[in-house]
């Protein structure tokens, strides 16, 4: 365990306005501001993956984080105004950059090619998170080469402070899923005043900063002595960190899936990685999370001379809900419904995150592995009745749902 006992001192220049405020509110004013912060934290040699320092503003969270993890504390960084975010993520290979962006819940290729300045606060938060993780990750080792004790540490202060609580919960779940699933080989400490993300981030330990003279000592004389010292110096603040080991279960994610009209498509159109169009014959479905539309899926009849069936036409998850599997759950629910008609259900995609999921999932069978699609001749189009492939020139993969 790492024991920290921090005495914070700050000299104060006297002024007429300070005296005015002190007189108005009967405040004691000295020439020095003092704070005493104490805490015990797990050491870096211990086998934990995610930690959290939480408490109200001014309770010493940042002071403890700086004292314990100064070298690993992420500092605000500059984003060029005219450079796409994929070009501002460092020198790593593109597959690592897109993989990390997808892991933190920013899985839209259309967003990847935008500059940071035009993104929403939620998207900016995930970009900052992805770049911090990428900068910490080793460049020459694969995930399996690093035991937990040797993985780099990333510490972020004011975690989720600038985003809505819904985005904070979803982003925390996405990050926890990526770290626990060994997709991102780092350890992570969040410093925040928001306790609502604890069950979503699922930390191994939580340090709660509490104001006042609470002591870990059992000796009453020691407690009385400390209390007297605080009363005698009202300009001094005292805070104690209480450590709890835990890994709470993530709250259950309840989705409501409904057949919807195509009128809902404009909400999702600009977030589709390929096209904003929707076929007139598309049958549309949406997943709702906490009564908010989160994901959209559309299917079409799939004409084939031997195995006619259905195919996935569009699959979109809104940026605020990416990273926790809502899109894939909607896709598989819709696929299962169509397979129950006795006809096969196919899906073709070029999105790296979806391809990665379906390759690993027992619910999908690879029909065509990732690669370029050959052009279809006019004779073949006439024989099969199929339109010319729109995925020519792109790396795609085709799957059949077998779940």
Could you describe each region identified by the protein language model?
Residues 1-45, 92, 217, 240-242:
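Pre-NBD coupling/linker segments of ABC/ABC-like ATPases
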Residues 259-321:
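A conserved beta-strand-loop-helix scaffold within acyl/acetyltransferase catalytic domains
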Residues 155-163:
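Walker B catalytic motif
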Residues 8, 37-106:
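ABC ATPase nucleotide-binding domain signature region
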């Amino acid at each position: 365990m790492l024991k920290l006992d921090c005495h914070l001192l700050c000299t104060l220049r006297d002024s007429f306005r300070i005296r005015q405020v002190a007189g108005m509110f009967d405040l004691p004013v000295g020439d020095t501001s003092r704070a005493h912060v104490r805490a015990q934290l797990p050491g870096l040699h211990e086998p934990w993956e995610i930690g959290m320092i939480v408490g109200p503003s001014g309770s010493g969270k940042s002071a403890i984080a700086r004292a314990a993890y100064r070298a690993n504390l992420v500092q605000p960084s500059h984003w060029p105004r005219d450079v796409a975010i994929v070009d501002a993520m460092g020198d790593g290979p593109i597959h690592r950059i897109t993989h990390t962006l997808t892991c933190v819940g920013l899985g839209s290729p259309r967003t990847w090619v935008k500059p940071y300045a035009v993104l929403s606060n939620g998207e900016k938060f995930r970009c900052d998170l992805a770049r911090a993780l990428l900068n910490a990750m080793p460049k020459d080792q694969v995930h399996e080469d690093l035991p937990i004790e040797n993985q780099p540490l990333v510490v972020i202060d004011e975690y989720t402070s600038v985003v809505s609580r819904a985005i904070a919960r979803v982003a925390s779940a996405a990050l926890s899923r990526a770290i626990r699933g060994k997709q991102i080989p780092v350890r992570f400490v969040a410093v925040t005043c928001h306790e609502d993300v604890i069950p979503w981030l699922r930390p191994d330990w939580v340090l709660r900063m509490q104001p006042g003279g609470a002591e870990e000592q059992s000796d009453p004389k020691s407690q009385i002595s400390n209390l007297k010292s605080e009363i005698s110096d009202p300009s001094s603040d005292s805070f104690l960190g209480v450590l709890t080991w835990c890994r709470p279960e993530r709250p259950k994610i309840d989705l409501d899936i409904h057949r919807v009209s195509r009128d809902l498509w404009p909400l999702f159109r600009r977030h589709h990685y390929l096209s904003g169009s929707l076929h007139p014959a598309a049958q549309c479905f949406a997943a709702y999370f906490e009564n908010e539309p989160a994901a959209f899926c559309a299917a079409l009849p799939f004409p084939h001379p031997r195995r006619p069936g259905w195919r996935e036409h569009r699959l979109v998850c809104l940026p605020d809900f990416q990273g926790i599997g809502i899109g894939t759950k909607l896709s598989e629910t819709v696929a299962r419904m169509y397979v129950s008609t006795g006809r096969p259900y196919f899906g073709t995609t070029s999105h790296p995150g979806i391809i990665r999921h379906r390759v690993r999932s027992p619910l999908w069978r690879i029909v065509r592995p990732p690669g370029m699609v050959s052009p279809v001749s006019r004779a073949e189009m006439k024989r099969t009745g199929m339109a010319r492939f729109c995925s020519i020139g792109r790396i795609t993969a085709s799957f059949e749902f077998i779940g």
